Amino acid sequence: MNKKITDSIIYVGVNDHQIDLFEGQYVVKNGMAYNSYVIFDDDIAVMDTVDINFTNEWLANIEEALNGRLPKYLIVQHMEPDHSANIENFMKKYPQTIIVGNDKTFKFMSQFFRNDSFLNTLVVKNGDTLSLGKHTLTFVFAPMIHWPEVMFTYDSFDKVLFSADAFGKFGANDVKEDWGDEARRYYIGIVGKYGVQVKNILNAASTLEIEKILPLHGPVLSAPLTHYLEKYTVWATYGIEKEGVLIVYTSIYGNTKSAAELLKNELLKLGTPSVEIYDLARSDMAEVVGKAFEYGRIALASPTYNMELFPYMDQFIHKLVERNFQNKTIGIISNGTWAPVSGKLIKDKLSLLKNITFLEPVVNILSSVSAENKDEIKWLARELAKGYSISTSDVDKHNTNSLFNIGYGLYVITTNDGKKDNGLIVNTVTQLTNTPNRVGVTINKLNYSHYIVEKTKKMNVNILSTDAPFSIFEIFGFQSGRNVDKFKDIGVHRSDNGLVYLSNYINSFMSLDIVSSIDLG
């Protein structure tokens, strides 16, 4: 499948729908893409090969793209077999080609192919350049992203960064899906251990003028690239993407599951903006590991098994430790009958990591959840939900200071249809009377939010501040809440009426009950 990327760069990669496990461990229900590119100039360069199972398709793609011309260079950015397996087959067809790589590239090449016939080579160093004519390629070494020989290639003519495995994702390119979730799962699984190295290469890339990023997996990323770079910065620095609490549990006879479900319900009562719960025995481990990096607050619940951690929890924690998991707040629920040590084992293993805060004490269950345990779980929920809820104990519900922030500007009204949160940009909010306090909000009755407000008789009004970015207007003004989750990448809290309000870009918010409505036509 050939595709034009720029006037002089053609995509010649392949999609793999035969694969079920990437690297023998990651479930890829939508397959994988193995990307390869051809740069056309006075001299032609082919960027990387593809998996061995797609030799014929890939070579046919290249032949079609070349249209009778011959390549001068094969640039090898990464020697992992899903990208290098066809070097030998390529050289048999185009023996005049010069293979470009670094010292480690050729060391690994000799180990994989045991072939001394690759004599037509060009060894490059970090920062070296290669002219193809109009195109000048600069090689930027990116060791341990995620192998030691990896290098990126910057094309200053088309302002393109060939990024090897960085900025890749799971999934074939002929499947339409959100980039973020599968890119996160890919990053955490494949590159997550090497945050320092990723941060260093991001700093180096920030000095370049880049309009497109061409990874070895996943789609080509085009300007504006801010969203993708911001995500990688958060992942590389082990930052928090999503406010809320992640609950991860294992259970043998259902008692630990009951404790985890009780914690979930208590967190929801407290207005926690997002609560996700996963049973490790019935979940994709890589997905849950990715979720653990997404949240800043996590609860782990596990029984003891043969005086050790239950195997799924042990494996989960091993994967966190292996990936330098850090900067988290952890609550622990331990269960056991005759040797209840799971809580201690969880804490001992995670104590090896940086900036892990444990909520003490551990909730210790003996076989089944007792009345005392229920109180302890409620306490744990309050600790995990701190700062998330606005309740009557925190504020005066009749405080009218928000009214002074009403002016000519824009507002986001937030609602909930009983299944999910929704939000909408409006431009007219007016204080109608002072005694009693009455506020008028104008909503287009064709919008889904109008239907929700009429049904639920409540809403929150978020008064936007002057620093609200244009992306806020795009999210809440340019798409329908019927079909998308508008709060997917937005920080929120939840007020005691059960509705969310924005945690950023607002001066204040008001929780309103609907006492009457007027149809203006």
Predicted regions and their residues:
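Short acidic active-site motifs
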Residues: 86, 284-288
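Active-site-proximal mixed secondary-structure blocks
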Residues: 393-521
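Short N-terminal or domain-adjacent regulatory/targeting segments
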Residues: 212-241, 315
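FMN-binding flavodoxin-like domain, especially the glycine-rich phosphate-binding loop
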Residues: 175-213, 218-220, 262-276, 288-394
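Conserved beta-strand hairpin/beta-sheet module of binuclear metal-dependent hydrolase folds
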Residues: 2-62, 152-155, 159-162, 256
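Active-site metal-binding motif and surrounding structural segment of the metallo-beta-lactamase
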Residues: 42, 53-100
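Metallo-beta-lactamase
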Residues: 3-7, 44, 51, 101-223
